Curated annotation (Swiss-Prot):
GO terms for cellular component: cytosolic small ribosomal subunit. Belongs to the bacterial ribosomal protein bS18 family. GO terms for molecular function: small ribosomal subunit rRNA binding; structural constituent of ribosome. The gene is rpsR. This is Small ribosomal subunit protein bS18. It comes from Chlamydia muridarum (strain MoPn / Nigg).
Amino acid sequence: MNRPVHNEHRRKRFAKKCPFVSAGWKTIDYKDVVTLKRFITERGKILPRRITGVSSRFQALLAQAVKRARHVGLLPFVGED
């Protein structure tokens, strides 16, 4: 039997480099709201690694920084409509 080939239509994924590693960052500061806003959606959700290209270490630090900024009041819990 001939199987249909579905792999021809798949897009090639390019390896994204972590922007924090490329810039030489060691930690992420929760008070740096401008940087944190680049990694959250309009609704206030943290973007996943597959979209942002952030490494696993910095994704954990990013999530922790966003949550701290929310509790302090620098970022909203719910996005701005």
